[in-house]
C-alpha cells in the first residue's frame, strides 16, 4: 500500500459539529488561525506554558520543534520547564537551549538538591512532598512556579513530533477571554504514527474506552462515568486551566495523572465550564506494551484502572468488589474485541495499516491486569496525591516562592537553604499576623 506522508494529509471541511455534556471545539480545517491576533490576546491575560521534561528530550528533534514554534508567541508571559536532570551542567545546557526566547523562561530543576531540601522542610508539617519522582511530581512543582505570575496555565509534553502553532492557540484561546466562562481545556486529536500512519493511542482505544463502557453496564449510567466518556481522548497529556482551578487541584503522582486530574476537575468545576479542543493530527514518542505487568503500557493501564475505580468511590460511592470482577473481565474482553473490529474497519477504509493480531494481544494483556490491580486497590484505597497549592500556601505562604527560587538560583550555591532563601529574598515584608502581633505587643507595653 502506498503511504502518503502524514504531514501532507489535510482533511477539508470536517463536518463533525456534535456537542454533548462538555463543549467541544472542532477543527474545521479552514485555516483561520491568526498569530498576530493570538499574541494580542495573550497580552490581555498573563499566560504561562509548562513543559515537564527529561534531559533526554533535548537530544530529540521534537523539543527543538516545540521551542522554535513557541518562539513566535511574543505575547506569552513565561515558559516553565520542569526539568529532571542529573547535574548542574545539564540544567545550564537546558537554559542555553531556551536562551533566545522572546519571553522569560525558567528552567526549574525538579530533582535538584536545593529543591529537595525545600520540599523536605515541609515534613515537619506532616506533608511528604519528596516524590515519587515522575510526570505528576514535575507538573505539581511546575504549577507552583507558574501560578505565581500567570492567570492561565497550559501544559504540553516535550515529545510532541507534530507540534504546530495551532496547538497552543486552540488550547489557550478558550481561557483567554473570560466571557467564554471556561476554566479547563482538554485536548483531543487523531493519534497517527508519522512513520507508518497506523493508529496509536492503545491505552485509550483498547483499555480506557472498553473499561468505561463495561463499568457503565455494571453500575449503570452514573454521572461521573458519563462525564469521563464525554472526553474523546481522556489520556491526552495536553490541557490548560485558570490559576484559580490549578491552585485547588490535588495532583496524582503516578501514571494515573491524566485520569486523576479529570477526577479533580469534576470535583471543582461544573461541566459547563469545561471544553475539549481538537488539535488535529498528533504524534509523540510511543510507549511499548512492556514485557511484564509492571512495565510500559501495562503498568499505565493498571494505575489508570485503580484511579478510575477510586474516583467512582469518591464521586458515586460505588465500590467494585471481587465478586463483580468476573463480570467486568467478561464484559471488558467482549467490548474490547468489538473495538478492535471497529478500529480495523476504520483503518481499512482510510487505507491505514492495522495489526489486528497485535491489538488483540494488547487487549488480552490489559484484561489480565484487572484482577491483580483490583486486589491491590482494595488492599489500599488511598491514592498518593500531592496536596493542592492552596493548602500549601495556607501552611507556608512563602513556600511556592522558596521552591521557585530553589529550582533556579538554589542550584548554584550550597548556601541556599530554605531558611537562607527566605532571608535573602528582597523586599520581604512581614505578614499581617506579624504586624498585628507587633502592634499588640507595643500596645501592651
Go through the PLM ranges and name each one.
Residues 163-189:
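Conserved donor-nucleotide/metal-binding helix-loop-beta segment in metal-dependent transferases, i.e.
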Residues 2, 6-27, 102, 285, ...:
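Terminal low-complexity segments of carbohydrate-biosynthetic enzymes
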Residues 253, 263-282:
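Catalytic donor-sugar/metal-binding loop of nucleotide-sugar-dependent glycosyltransferases
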Residues 90-149:
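Active-site-proximal specificity loops/subdomain of glycosyltransferases
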Residues 149-161:
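Short beta-strand-to-loop acidic/aromatic patch adjacent to the donor-nucleotide binding site
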Residues 9-71:
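N-proximal low-complexity "stem/linker" segments adjacent to membrane-targeting elements
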Residues 195-205, 216-238:
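A recurrent flexible, glycine/aromatic-enriched loop bordering the glycosyltransferase active site
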Residues 75-87, 106-112:
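Short beta-strand/loop segment that forms part of the nucleotide-sugar
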Amino acid at each position: 500500500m502506498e503511504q502518503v506522508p502524514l504531514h501532507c494529509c489535510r482533511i477539508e471541511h470536517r463536518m463533525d459539529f456534535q456537542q454533548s455534556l462538555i463543549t467541544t471545539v472542532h477543527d474545521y480545517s479552514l485555516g483561520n488561525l491568526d498569530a498576530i491576533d493570538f499574541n494580542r490576546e495573550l497580552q490581555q491575560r498573563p499566560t504561562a506554558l509548562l513543559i515537564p521534561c527529561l534531559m533526554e528530550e533535548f537530544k530529540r528533534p521534537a523539543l527543538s520543534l516545540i521551542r522554535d514554534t513557541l518562539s513566535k508567541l511574543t505575547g506569552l508571559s513565561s515558559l516553565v520547564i520542569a526539568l529532571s536532570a542529573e547535574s548542574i551542567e545539564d540544567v545550564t545546557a537546558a537554559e542555553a537551549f531556551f536562551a533566545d526566547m522572546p519571553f522569560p523562561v525558567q528552567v526549574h530543576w525538579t530533582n535538584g538538591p536545593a529543591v529537595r531540601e525545600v520540599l523536605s522542610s515541609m515534613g515537619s508539617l506532616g506533608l511528604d512532598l519528596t516524590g515519587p519522582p515522575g510526570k505528576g511530581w514535575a507538573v505539581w512543582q511546575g504549577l507552583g512556579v507558574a501560578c505565581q505570575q500567570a492567570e492561565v496555565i497550559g501544559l504540553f509534553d516535550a515529545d510532541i513530533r507534530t507540534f504546530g502553532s495551532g496547538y497552543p492557540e486552540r488550547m489557550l484561546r478558550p481561557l483567554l477571554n473570560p466571557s467564554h466562562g471556561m476554566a479547563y481545556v482538554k485536548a483531543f486529536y487523531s493519534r497517527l504514527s508519522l512513520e507508518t500512519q497506523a493508529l496509536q493511542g492503545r491505552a485509550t482505544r483498547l483499555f480506557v474506552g472498553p473499561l468505561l463502557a463495561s463499568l457503565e453496564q455494571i453500575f449503570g449510567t452514573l454521572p461521573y462515568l458519563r462525564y469521563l466518556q464525554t472526553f474523546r481522548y481522556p489520556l491526552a497529556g495536553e490541557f490548560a486551566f485558570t490559576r484559580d482551578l490549578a491552585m485547588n487541584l490535588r495532583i496524582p503522582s503516578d501514571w494515573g495523572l491524566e485520569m486523576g486530574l479529570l477526577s479533580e476537575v469534576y470535583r471543582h468545576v461544573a461541566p459547563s465550564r469545561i471544553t475539549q479542543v481538537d488539535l488535529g493530527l498528533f504524534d509523540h514518542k510511543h510507549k511499548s506494551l512492556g514485557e511484564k505487568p509492571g512495565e510500559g503500557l501495562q503498568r499505565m493501564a493498571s494505575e489508570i484502572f485503580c484511579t478510575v475505580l477510586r474516583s467512582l468511590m469518591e464521586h458515586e460511592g460505588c465500590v467494585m468488589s471481587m465478586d463483580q470482577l468476573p463480570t467486568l473481565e467478561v464484559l471488558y474482553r467482549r467490548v474490547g474485541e468489538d473495538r478492535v473490529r471497529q478500529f480495523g474497519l476504520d483503518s481499512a477504509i482510510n487505507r491505514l495499516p492495522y495489526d489486528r493480531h497485535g491489538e488483540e494481544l494488547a487487549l488480552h494483556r490489559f484484561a489480565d491486569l484487572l484482577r491483580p490491580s483490583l486486589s491491590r486497590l482494595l488492599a489500599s484505597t488511598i491514592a498518593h496525591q500531592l496536596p493542592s497549592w492552596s493548602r500549601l500556601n495556607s501552611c507556608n505562604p512563602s513556600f511556592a516562592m522558596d521552591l521557585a527560587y530553589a529550582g533556579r538560583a538554589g542550584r548554584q550555591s550550597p548556601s541556599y537553604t530554605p531558611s537562607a532563601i527566605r532571608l535573602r529574598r528582597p523586599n520581604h515584608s512581614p505578614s499581617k499576623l506579624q504586624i498585628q502581633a507587633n502592634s499588640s505587643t507595643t500596645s501592651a507595653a
